[in-house]
Amino acid sequence: MSYMPAQNRTMSHNNQYNPPDLPPMVSAKEQTLMWQQNSYLGDSGIHSGAVTQVPSLSGKEDEEMEGDPLMFDLDTGFPQNFTQDQVDDMNQQLSQTRSQRVRAAMFPETLEEGIEIPSTQFDPQQPTAVQRLSEPSQMLKHAVVNLINYQDDAELATRAIPELIKLLNDEDQVVVSQAAMMVHQLSKKEASRHAIMNSPQMVAALVRAISNSNDLESTKAAVGTLHNLSHHRQGLLAIFKSGGIPALVKLLSSPVESVLFYAITTLHNLLLHQDGSKMAVRLAGGLQKMVTLLQRNNVKFLAIVTDCLQILAYGNQESKLIILASGGPNELVRIMRSYDYEKLLWTTSRVLKVLSVCSSNKPAIVDAGGMQALAMHLGNMSPRLVQNCLWTLRNLSDAATKVEGLEALLQSLVQVLGSTDVNVVTCAAGILSNLTCNNQRNKATVCQVGGVDALVRTIINAGDREEITEPAVCALRHLTSRHVDSELAQNAVRLNYGLSVIVKLLHPPSRWPLIKAVIGLIRNLALCPANHAPLREHGAIHHLVRLLMRAFQDTERQRSSIATTGSQQPSAYADGVRMEEIVEGTVGALHILARESHNRALIRQQSVIPIFVRLLFNEIENIQRVAAGVLCELAADKEGAEIIEQEGATGPLTDLLHSRNEGVATYAAAVLFRMSEDKPQDYKKRLSIELTNSLLREDNNIWANADLGMGPDLQVGSLQGASALILLLYIFSISPYRLFAGYDTLPIDSMQGLEISSPVGGGGATGNSGGVNSASAGSGAVVPPSGAPTSPYSMDMDVGEIDAGALNFDLDAMPTPPNDNNNLAAWYDTDC
């Protein structure tokens, strides 16, 4: 039974009475009488007035008293009155056990078993004063005990180390084994562990025991000791200086799991914290052994191994090549496919991320199925794992443009674009940009899973973050050209309110790489007639002309500088972008926009036709081609044709009829044809003769060995010069003379739909593939009859066999070319 002096108790009556402090020398009998006078026992309420309050009308207890945990009922604590003898006994018991209570609180281990000590604690949640004071004393006692034990351990180890070193060097393997196990036990205590690591002779003896002993138990004990030492920097240094790394690497071939664990964790600690360890592990052949260990199935063990590989491979090309030669990519991809332990997946993805920047490892990872394996974890709940997978996928994506079976990855990437993490969105946009480059299947897949809508929203939400907008714009540029759903994508950008945002990206402070991508996207969007008016209303033509003038001025200044100094300076660059690329891109976009009459009128008002004419003299054939193309569209209007002629375009256009670039020659012929519509018959006759002569010039050279400025993949043996002839014959074939039997005269209104790609080489501004192989032309491709000249442009042209003797042209009419935009310049579908 707990007892609490009256002075420390809280009464439950409304009229509380606290007696004055008792004199220090009052007998127990007098104290009892005073307690009785103070109504602590059997109070009737007459003397104290404790129950004289008016009872509640509701008959309920006071709400405040009802919920107060400190209130208590005296009748419960004292069910009956105590006699004087009982009170004396209680006082005597408390007095006699006071020292025992103090001892129990401060030194409980000194009490004898079976002794019951009365407690003075009334509330279990409130410790007594003695209990509160005992906490610091217990801490002090434990500190003293630990200090004594530490000192004992240190002294013991210091005295034992010399003898243990001798035993470790003994020739008897049994002695060595016993000594190694003893040292291992000592290393488990901090004091003796410090004594061991402070002894270079002891660490060296342990390393020798590992290297020379064939006994598994002694090896296990010795490497276990090194493992314990490796948790301290001083121990790591001692192991490194004693030549422990080669010995530990050797143990990576051990068949014993515990030895392997000790060895790999010790090496891991060395690689993390000890300078020089990386090179030592490489020289000892550790990389090869670690790659071999990847075949094991213990996930925690594999996590340590992969982390070691990441440390060794990071920033070291030689290590990456060693991992490749040892079959590392295949094993790492297997781990990503086979396990779900987050830490293992994270460490493995870190290794793959390091290897993915190596040009040699990149295709190996892709071939091993790395893209699909990494895609499996894009929905993982671990942000760090998802981030590593995305970075790795982005690094690999430029080598995976021809990989099939990426539908699940593409769908996941489209979903990831909705993330609020800037890094995640940046990676996803970059991966989509690379995987949709020149891959029609991936383009169609992304469009079908809502990729266009997601990319437009991404661009809108990105604001001025060019690390997001640039890859997103590039991805849209790819999706809007050269695949079955490209027209749907072109419309989807407009329907998702993306045109205004895209045009605004042409404004400052956008940098040139982003501007270049936007120009290509606008050019592709203009292929959809429904986009012509919105693009014009959002100011696309004005900004394209502004950029063209700026880039043209930069290139002209560069030309003048070269002419003045005579030096061969490189082309004008800005943020890594050649200004010639901007010239080509803007003129190409204006070329497509000029297919619409209102756009042609606006372009004429910009006073930019003189620049187009001057670009006909440019040494870069791609620029000549787009310049001739936009002039071809502008010449469809009488006003445009007159301005072109006034700017002196007839001369350069006539010269370009002799160009070895098929597109340039064809556009030049078309412009001259349109300019001649209002000319006298004599002028038309002279132009007809000029065209005939240009086609028949150096006939043998053209058909045998002429260099058309095309890449080897686009040249077809001795027939390489025939494509330009086919194009020109197509343009001028329909005449009263009916050079090709079976073709009816068609009304000609415009060149809309004619799209002539530039071939590779010949001074192309971008250096990208400019043509599309006929094998990939799609359903629009037409195979010429046997013996007829072939061309990469045959997919857009449907012509019969050519009568080589009928080479007369009548300039009264020109047919409308087929409206097929599959064969576009590759400048608009690259990731450059």
UniProtKB/Swiss-Prot annotation:
One GO BP annotation of this record: neuroblast fate commitment
Pfam families recorded: Arm
Annotated keywords: Cell adhesion, Cell junction, Cell membrane, Cytoplasm, Developmental protein, Membrane, Repeat, Segmentation polarity protein, Wnt signaling pathway
InterPro entries linked: ARM-like, ARM-type_fold, Armadillo, Beta-catenin
GO CC field: adherens junction; cytoplasm; plasma membrane
Membrane topology: Peripheral membrane protein
Keyword Repeat: yes
Region Disordered, residue ranges: 765-792
Composition bias, Low complexity: 771-789
ARM repeats (start-end): 149-188, 191-231, 233-272, 275-314, 359-397, 398-437, 440-481, 487-527, 597-636, 638-677
GO MF assignments: cadherin binding
Location within or outside the cell: Cytoplasm; Cell membrane; Cell junction, Adherens junction
Family: Belongs to the beta-catenin family.
Record's function text: May associate with CadN and participate in the transmission of developmental information. Can associate with alpha-catenin. Accumulates through wg signaling; arm function in wg signal transduction is required early in development for determination of neuroblast fate. Arm and Abl proteins function cooperatively at adherens junctions in both the CNS and epidermis.
Name of the protein: Armadillo segment polarity protein
Lineage: Eukaryota, Metazoa, Ecdysozoa, Arthropoda, Hexapoda
Gene assigned in the entry: arm
